[in-house]
A protein has these predicted regions:
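Beta/alpha (TIM)-barrel catalytic core signal, keyed to glycine-rich beta->alpha loops juxtaposed to Asp/Glu
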Residues: 3-11, 16, 140-294
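Acidic (Asp/Glu)-rich catalytic clusters
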Residues: 20, 81-92, 125-128, 179-181, ...
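N-terminal small/glycine-rich loop or linker at the start of catalytic domains
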Residues: 21-41, 94-107, 131, 136, ...
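Conserved beta-strand positions
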Residues: 30, 67, 95, 134-137, ...
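Alpha-helix N-cap and loop-to-helix initiation/capping positions
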Residues: 42-49, 75, 79, 107-115, ...
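Short, acidic/polar
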Residues: 43-57, 111-127, 171-176
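Active-site groove signature of glycoside hydrolases
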Residues: 124-143
């Protein structure tokens, strides 16, 4: 649920959110998917820079890092641990399981309980954790009964290996069904200023006090173009289109927790600066009209 507390650092200006009444984070987090090679596969082009990015994120006040075993695979989790372990107090690390990676840009759902339990064990080992703060089902595998997949996470939670459970790329019905099996604290769906297909999911998260984590929050490249509404707003605010897009997300709902990712310290610093960018009602209205027209 959103709170009125104050996190430290520039990222703290984004406001706060609490998962499950006990995990307090700054709303602007960091997504670690880009700390890998092309196709979200293998090592990053510059591992030293990737390590610098993660460390700089924490210096800027970010205390919520989202990763997954599928990123690399395994590479992203390993870089997070190498950069930050032993972890600073208050850092919340979220990861995900439920995919297999046969190659670059290839993703295959695997929700078999034995796979999910093995995936969680691997993440614990790579991240050097005794317990994962937020473990998310990366996708609901249509080949496996959802209750079996969620039951595996419930078992892991009962064993003390994960603290809280989240979902990814789900609709409202799937969230409700999951909540009948195990407590859910977050949903991670694709969402941005230019992609709002999951408005109903966002509204449900607001009603339930669930964190809504938009992946692809900058809609990679869709914000470009000097004639676009976002670029026009950015020029008025003396900001970048990406900063406007992130500031819009933060203003859109107190349960939205953006996790922009990058492998560049420069881009990271630009993204975090969005926490201090004020979006007025006129700009919110203009961006809303842009969405309705698209």
């Amino acid at each position: 649920m959103p709170t009125k507390g104050h996190s430290k650092g520039l990222a703290g200006k984004s406001g706060e959110f609490v998962f499950g009444n006990d995990l307090r984070i700054a709303r602007l987090g960091f997504g670690a998917m880009r700390l890998t090679g092309k196709g979200i596969w293998g090592e990053p082009a510059d591992r030293a820079e990737a390590l610098r990015v993660v460390r700089r994120a924490v210096e800027l006040g970010i205390n919520f890092i989202d990763t997954a075993d599928a990123y690399g695979p395994n590479v992203s989790e390993e870089i997070v641990a190498e950069a930050l372990h032993p972890y600073p107090a208050g850092l919340v690390i979220a990861t995900k399981g439920g995919f297999e990676r046969p190659g670059p840009d290839r993703w295959v759902e695997n929700g078999r309980p034995e796979h999910l339990k093995s995936a969680c064990e691997g993440s614990l080992r790579r991240l050097k954790l005794d317990r994962i703060d937020l473990y998310q089902l990366h996708r609901i595998d249509p080949k496996v009964p959802a209750e079996d997949q969620l039951g595996a996470l419930k078992d892991l939670q009962a064993q003390g290996k994960i603290k809280h459970i989240g979902l990814s790329e789900v609709n409202v019905r799937q969230i409700r069904d999951a909540q009948s099996i195990v407590p859910i604290v977050s949903v991670q769906n694709r969402y941005s200023v230019s992609d709002r297909a999951y408005e109903d999911v966002l509204e449900y998260c607001e009603q339930q006090g669930l964190g809504f984590i938009p992946w692809f929050p900058l809609a990679a490249g869709q914000l470009a173009g000097t004639r676009s509404t976002v670029s026009s707003m950015a020029a008025q605010l003396k900001a970048t289109p990406s900063q406007v897009a992130l500031a819009w997300l933060l203003a859109r709902s107190p349960v939205i927790l953006p996790i922009p990712g990058t492998a560049s310290v420069k881009h990271l610093e630009e993204n975090v600066a969005s926490a201090d960018l004020a979006i007025n009602e006129d700009i919110m209205q203009a961006l809303g009209e842009m969405a309705r027209a698209s």
